[in-house]
């Protein structure tokens, strides 16, 4: 691919609407000792797989987003903000299903609460078949496919298998083990997800040393050529298999509260 060519990317997975409710609190409620927040502004943005799609567009890719939404106001708002971001929308509307919505309450600049509305119900058979048909058409012309699996019900075994032949498959999943049979090019778990993969529990230990010691096992369990593990503000650790096997460089980065990489 030439340097001037646009990357064709397909993002498939669990889409959601992220909302931030901004306000200030200067008194307590009469009915309970809780602050009364005066709502001053609301900010809506693509979340989950939709956020990944918007980020890829911002990096210069041409993106097609495949996923599931409900026939509700939240789904309509998600499509609106995706269009503003320049994302190609291929979202299947399932009547009676609720679009995932995460609301963050920000009081005087401080994140104080998050309210989630989600639907983890099994996809109807017709919806799975339609999703598979849309994926087949989308993946055929893609340079890269990104799967965002946050447990929202999109990735049935059949949908995962349909992505096994993708030209370059990158997986961001809360549970990466089910993706092993797809042999992804890369998976992007956070530290806690890697610990669960290894059968342990996250504790107050040296995270970098722990991940480095288990690098080969992590690659084996995921079936991926590359594993990129996010460590919040500590940075990112890269595990690579093959001729260039090893553990990559870790760099620090600033994480804004409420917008971190593990906030899905």
Residues of each region from the PLM?
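Short, flexible hinge/linker loops that cap or flank conserved catalytic cores
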Residues: 2-3, 263
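A short, aliphatic-rich alpha-helical micro-motif
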Residues: 4, 139-140, 181-182
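Conserved N-terminal subdomain of the carbohydrate kinase-like
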Residues: 8-9, 17-146, 157
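Structural motif
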Residues: 10-12, 114, 143-146, 170, ...
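Short beta-strand/turn micro-motifs composed of small residues
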Residues: 13, 67-70, 173, 231
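Active-site metal-binding loops of divalent metal-dependent hydrolases
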Residues: 14-15, 150
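Conserved phosphate/ATP/ADP-binding segment of small-molecule kinases
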Residues: 150-252
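Short glycine/threonine-rich catalytic loop with a Thr-x-Gly-x-Asp
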Residues: 252-264
